[in-house]
């Protein structure tokens, strides 16, 4: 796991904070911006077309959606609907991509210069309902409903996610409240205080249970607004000093080859920065009783974000120092690591989906992880397919070993057989 470089897939004209991949179209969606400050740095959501060209995965800018003075800090995807966390609000976007016959001129006076962003040329920003057409692919993005989701003195929505059937979305922010909203009307259906202080992350399970982690060092499991249990990762964890830890991220994941199986994965980081930083930890939990199954150290770099692959096979991690790693979910062993890939905090990571266009784009690799950071770059991390020995070859080797053993015994002891 030495030093290596990850290929740069795309560079945006603004800091990137959030990332999603649409499995049906293969669109990579990256969002961010410079915020409301008048620094000249724009805010937007970029839709990138992924293509496999000569065995290499590439990304080209297909559409740039202007978010005016609001930088998108977090994203969730449900079919053709995006939920974007922008300051204290959640903005729903709908995007539609389909093939067109022939190339048509771009509508709405677009100044887009083609699907690939040319060096030195700023991408055009698209207003509500704008369309872009390139090489037969049309993309239309429109703003839907928006609602304020956080009401603290310094309000900020920090996380958003959809439920399993995409009919509800949950938000959390700096005021410590979880709020659940209908999709797409954004009518509020539930509100409750989950943490004292900021909510760092939340995850909705297929059975409706909600897991929240906060800066108050707690991780809680909820059924609607009723507390089911609190997580205690140290019950099955390592023995260490009295250094306080807090939960940084949580994600549900499937159990490979077990359709009914469910796992919860959490990341624990030191609550305070120390001169000699203690390690961070990954924990796998039983998704039904929320007991810890396995805990492993994931290094001394503070983890900033977590993602789980679609099949639940792999975990992707980003750190505040810019490193990116891929772990296998079963044993929590590290399979891939790039130190300081970005050189600055990794703000989000996302796996290439394993359905839809995913297998076509993956090529001969086992999985692909995308990472974005404040350095405005989107990087690609590929895990080569692990070589395995065919069963027939193992059987042949066993038979050969038996024959050689018999011949050796026969030569050493002529009357043995």
From Swiss-Prot:
InterPro entries: Quinoprotein_ADH-like_sf, Sec12-like, WD40/YVTN_repeat-like_dom_sf, WD40_rpt. The keyword NADP does not apply. Its main location: endoplasmic reticulum. Residues 1-388 are cytoplasmic. It is found in: Endoplasmic reticulum membrane; Nucleus. Residues 104-115 have a biased composition (Basic and acidic residues). Residues 101-130 are annotated as: Disordered. PANTHER family: PROLACTIN REGULATORY ELEMENT BINDING PROTEIN (PTHR23284), PROLACTIN REGULATORY ELEMENT-BINDING PROTEIN (PTHR23284:SF0). Interacts with SAR1B (GDP-bound form). Interacts with MIA2; recruits PREB to endoplasmic reticulum exit sites. Interacts with CIDEB; facilitating loading of SCAP-SREBP into COPII vesicles. This is Guanine nucleotide-exchange factor SEC12. The gene is PREB.
């Amino acid at each position: 796991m030495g030093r290596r470089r990850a290929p740069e897939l795309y560079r945006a004209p603004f800091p990137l904070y959030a990332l999603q991949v649409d499995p049906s179209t293969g669109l990579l969606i990256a969002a961010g911006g410079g915020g409301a400050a008048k620094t000249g740095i724009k805010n937007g959501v970029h839709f990138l077309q992924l293509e496999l060209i000569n065995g290499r995965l590439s990304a080209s800018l297909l559409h740039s959606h202007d978010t005016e003075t609001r930088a998108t800090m977090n994203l969730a995807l449900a079919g053709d609907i995006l939920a974007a966390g922008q300051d204290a609000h959640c903005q729903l976007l709908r995007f539609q991509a389909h093939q067109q016959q022939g190339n048509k001129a771009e509508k709405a006076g677009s100044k887009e210069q083609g699907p690939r962003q040319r060096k030195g040329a700023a991408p055009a920003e698209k207003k509500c309902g704008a369309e872009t057409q390139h090489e037969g692919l049309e993309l239309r993005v429109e703003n839907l409903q928006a609602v304020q989701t956080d009401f603290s003195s310094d309000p900020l929505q920090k996380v958003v996610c959809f439920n399993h059937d995409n009919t509800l979305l949950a938000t959390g922010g700096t005021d410590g409240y979880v709020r659940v909203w209908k999709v797409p009307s954004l009518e509020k259906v539930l509100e409750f205080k989950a943490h004292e202080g900021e909510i760092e992350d939340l995850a909705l399970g297929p059975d409706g249970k909600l897991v929240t982690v906060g800066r108050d060092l707690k991780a809680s499991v909820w059924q609607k607004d009723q507390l089911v249990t609190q997580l205690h990762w140290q019950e099955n964890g390592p023995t260490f000093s009295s250094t306080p830890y807090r939960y940084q991220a949580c994600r549900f994941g499937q159990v490979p080859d077990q359709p009914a199986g469910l796992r919860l994965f959490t990341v624990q980081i030191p609550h305070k920065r120390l001169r000699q930083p203690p390690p961070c930890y990954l924990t796998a939990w039983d998704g039904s009783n929320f007991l810890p199954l396995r805990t492993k150290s994931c290094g001394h770099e503070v983890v900033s974000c977590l993602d789980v692959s679609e099949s639940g096979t792999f975990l992707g991690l980003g750190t505040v120092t810019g490193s990116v790693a891929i772990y296998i979910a079963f044993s929590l062993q590290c399979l891939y690591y790039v130190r300081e890939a970005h050189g600055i905090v990794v703000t989000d990571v996302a796996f290439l989906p394993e359905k839809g266009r995913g297998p076509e784009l993956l090529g001969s690799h086992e999985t692909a992880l995308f990472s974005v950071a404040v350095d405005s770059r989107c990087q690609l991390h590929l895990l080569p397919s692990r070589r395995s020995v065919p069963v027939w070859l193992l059987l042949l080797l066993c038979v050969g070993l038996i024959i050689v053993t018999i011949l050796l015994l026969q030569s050493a002891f002529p009357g043995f057989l």
